[in-house]
Amino acid sequence: MRLSRIGTPKVSVTRVIPVRNVVIARRKPVRASNTDAKTWLMKEEQRRIRQKEQEMKQRLEELERFKTKVQKSYIRKEDRHLAQEIEKDLDIITDDYNLDSDVDLVFGELMQAEEQPKSLKSLPGASDASDNTDKSVELFSFPSPNLTLPEKVIHHIGPLVKHISNPENIQWGRLLLDLEKNQGFNGLSAVDVTRLIQNIPKEEKYQHMSLIHEMMFNSGISPDRYLTDLMMTAFSERSYYEPLVEALFQDYDINGWAPTDYTFGALIKVYSKGKKLDKINNLLNQMKLKYHKEPNKKIYTMVLQTCMKIDDYKKTSEVFDAMKFNSVATNPDTTAYGSMILMHVLNDNVEAALDLYDNLETEPDETILLALARGCSSRKVLINRGWDFIIEYYKRKFPLNEKLMTVMMYLTSRDGDLSLTRAIYNTIHESRFKMTESFSMNKNDGIALNVLLRGYFKYPDNHTVQSKTNDAVVALRRSTLALNHFGYHPKATPFLPVNELEEKHILPEVQAIWSYIILHYPDIVTSELVGTYLMILATRGSMADFNKAFEELTLKPVFEQVDNAVAVEEESEQSSELSDLRLTPLAIRLSSNIQIKYPRNHDIYHIALQACINNKDIELGQRIWQERGRFRKTPEFSMQPRNVKHNQDFEFARDMLKLLVNCNELNDACRLLLSTETQFNWEWTYVKPVYIMAEQLGDEYAKKVVRRVVRNKKSKWREEYLQGM
């Protein structure tokens, strides 16, 4: 044993520790058998198949829905297209917006007689085919892209397709006759016929519908609802097809179809053409009670225009109010507003027209502005407002035409601006001459001529005209006068070559213009023109001038006697006093040989009595009074409404009373008052001149007559009269 350095022996001890032999074995993965794997794979595949099937099913359903949607959309598009075509045929913007230069002629335009039905052979293009066809047309082998004829129709036409290659030269009558000879409508459906009709211009459809209807019958084609609508709208263009339109309407009840707005529109349109307001009212009631439909805006507008055609002012206002207050969908549009404003103006209710314009919810069109300006020309206090509408017309860049210039003449004539009236009238004819290089006048030119003559009658008017104070109008006036050239052609209207006329030149110029018209354009002369010319002579000419024109231009009345024999007033013998022909212009001498005479009516007698008042001619006045008494027996007077006859009689009696007072015939004035005491409402304002004359002459009897006449009336002037006694 060895000892350590420090003396301690080193002892080695060995400890035996037993070690357990631990074996950690790696766990092997459990592997599925082949059968389980196949089952799992099969289920997984089935799941994926089911998923794909579900996806495919969803896609198929989506495609089916899309297909259905496309089909419905196409059908709706077709329906909408057909509806639009029918609606186009029901367009209600008719002749009452094609105004002449004078809006007062609207009724004349609307009341024009319609043409009578024509036979098929007399229709344009209905003659047999001719071999002399245009070679350029034959070069085309297919219809124009503007035409959408059904393929079957094109096949039936065959070589005749050249007739429809140029849409501007289509002879529909000839084409349909050739089609009838070549299989007609055999093999065609109602839709094919509908598309064929849609290609025919609206204004020609009604001419060919009889032949089309016959071919449909021969081919056994039963019209569907759309084709029936289209046929109704085509036939509704003429009032004499009313029974046929009504028969087609009965097919709706027979087939169980629900009438559409277009169906009712066609019926109302044909009733409107015939001015059958009662039938329209019955149909509107049926729409509400039987079919539970409210009239739409177009139907209301057609009813509105029908009321205008028959000059039923009250009914027109009622229809317009119904449009305003029924619903938002029927609110009047510009067309309806224009119709109502025009109706107000035509019935001298300008204030109502202005109120309507102030409440206008749409932009005004040219018709509205011109109608309002024309209406304002009837009131002196509204002249400036009328010019505002003209300036608005210019700002909106509406066409500058004769219609506008004629309305401007109304304003200048009423305002007493003769210089501008003459310049505008001359500009109208100078512009027309520069465009056509010829002189011509028609009936419408008589309107502007009448306005021009009124300008002479109202000039001078001791007030400052609006065209000299309104800044915008001043510029227009200045340019018009500066560009005016009276001597643009030797055959032009014979104006004196000056813009400003002197008083002494007015009557000679009027007489020269009248002779010029009688010599060159006697066809445009009307009774209104004759009346205006006579009024100028009554106020500016001598009694001799008036008497001469009165006898030359008017005819005495024809009236029925008790024994039923017709009596004619004898024409007075021409005066033996001949005027100095050397001092009479050649045109006036020539025009005096042209016989243009119009029967005397109330207006002519009123003018004649005014001439007697101005010239204090009691003798002629008494003859006029007696002659008018015989005129009252004529059909022209007796056929008028009772209130019209009463008003005309009262107006003439007031004129006669004024003549008697002016001629100091106090006793005759009293006899007139007593003889008509119970017939007329003699208010103080009418009899005041008689009382003043009686006061001046100290005639107590005449004063007593005036008191009696006034006291027997419930006059609003009675208190004023009693206070002034």
UniProtKB/Swiss-Prot annotation:
Gene3D superfamilies: Tetratricopeptide repeat domain. The keyword Metal-binding does not apply. One of its GO terms (biological process) is RNA splicing. Residues 1-21 form a transit peptide. Its main location: mitochondrion. It comes from the Eukaryota. GO terms for cellular component: mitochondrion. InterPro entries: TPR-like_helical_dom_sf (IPR011990). PPR repeats lie at residues 189-223, 224-259, 260-290, 296-330, 333-363, 401-435, 601-635. It is found in: Mitochondrion. Keywords: Mitochondrion, mRNA processing, mRNA splicing, Repeat, Transit peptide. Involved in mitochondrial-nuclear incompatibility, a major determinant in reproductive isolation between species, through hybrid incompatibility of Ccm1 and its interacting partner 15S rRNA between yeast species. Regulates mitochondrial small subunit maturation by controlling 15S rRNA 5'-end processing. Localizes to the 5' precursor of the 15S rRNA in a position that is subsequently occupied by mS47 in the mature yeast mtSSU. Uses structure and sequence-specific RNA recognition, binding to a single-stranded region of the precursor and specifically recognizing bases -6 to -1. The exchange of Ccm1 for mS47 is coupled to the irreversible removal of precursor rRNA that is accompanied by conformational changes of the mitoribosomal proteins uS5m and mS26. Binds to mitochondrial small subunit 15S rRNA. Belongs to the CCM1 family. This is Mitochondrial 15S rRNA processing factor CCM1. It comes from Komagataella phaffii (strain GS115 / ATCC 20864) (Yeast).
